[in-house]
């Protein structure tokens, strides 16, 4: 066995050769350089930002959002797009389902004029477009809606009754292998929206599974299970849904946390509703009977009135959000102009 100095010298020579061939930073000791903080994109719900552990969705990673139909998956993704754009970022939406509603997206705060949209014919075309956009280095976030709609070319060109076992799974596996490194280098967040299917013959455990094979489960840094748990009503009229999101996988923070928030029809995630819920939980907002009070000032009787007060008084809402984030140690900068994504120490 070589002596320790000889081994160290041989290692240094090898590292120098690697850096010469593949560029500086291709290989390094983990302690050589201070880890860069994880940059994030806020989700629009402070409860979900807290559940994610770092204040939002991590940049440069693969995110999977799945759940039953009409549970709020696309709404959560569009809020992330709006927040990325608010910070000056560029966003793309791959509408494989051909179901994007520009008017609804605009109501959620998405700048539809600058949003890049593609409605591809095949799964191969969709993922090739995503790969090219990511490798441009100019994209901050891309949403693929949805994995189930990424139909392989062979299936489209075949007959209706033909069997195409594993085609989509192989397509996703190949695409994610190519994409993951480029995402990290460019700092682009890729959100894959996915649907649920039932596994036949399951006797024990959950029969639910997601489409597109197992590759996405492995490559995703964050997987979010979105469920509608309650219908919100104003009298007899339905005005929205109470939504629960479970973080079933998280590579950047402890997983299995849950968040609940309101999604209002035509308005999306209620930021003010989340602030009221979290403010009460953290002791910044006092609830006495039906009244909500903040630092001696009455916000309103009932959650809806308190929500409207914060909607009309953005400065108070920003102040509450700033205090919650400081107490919990999650970081997005809250200014008088709104919420801006910022690096988070982790």
UniProtKB/Swiss-Prot annotation:
One of the GO biological process terms = DNA repair
Record Pfam families: RecA, RecA_C
Annotated keywords: ATP-binding, Cytoplasm, DNA damage, DNA recombination, DNA repair, DNA-binding, Nucleotide-binding, SOS response
> What GO terms are given for molecular function?
ATP binding; ATP hydrolysis activity; ATP-dependent DNA damage sensor activity; damaged DNA binding; single-stranded DNA binding
Classification via PROSITE patterns: RECA_1, RECA_2, RECA_3
Name any GO cellular component annotation.
Answer: cytosol
Q: Which SUPFAM superfamilies does this entry report, sorted A to Z? A: P-loop containing nucleoside triphosphate hydrolases (SSF52540), RecA protein, C-terminal domain (SSF54752)
Localisation per UniProt entry: Cytoplasm
Keyword Phosphoprotein among record annotations? no
Query: What positions does the entry give for ATP binding?
Result: 67-74
Family under the similarity heading? Belongs to the RecA family.
- Name the job this protein performs: Can catalyze the hydrolysis of ATP in the presence of single-stranded DNA, the ATP-dependent uptake of single-stranded DNA by duplex DNA, and the ATP-dependent hybridization of homologous single-stranded DNAs. It interacts with LexA causing its activation and leading to its autocatalytic cleavage.
The entry's protein name is: Protein RecA
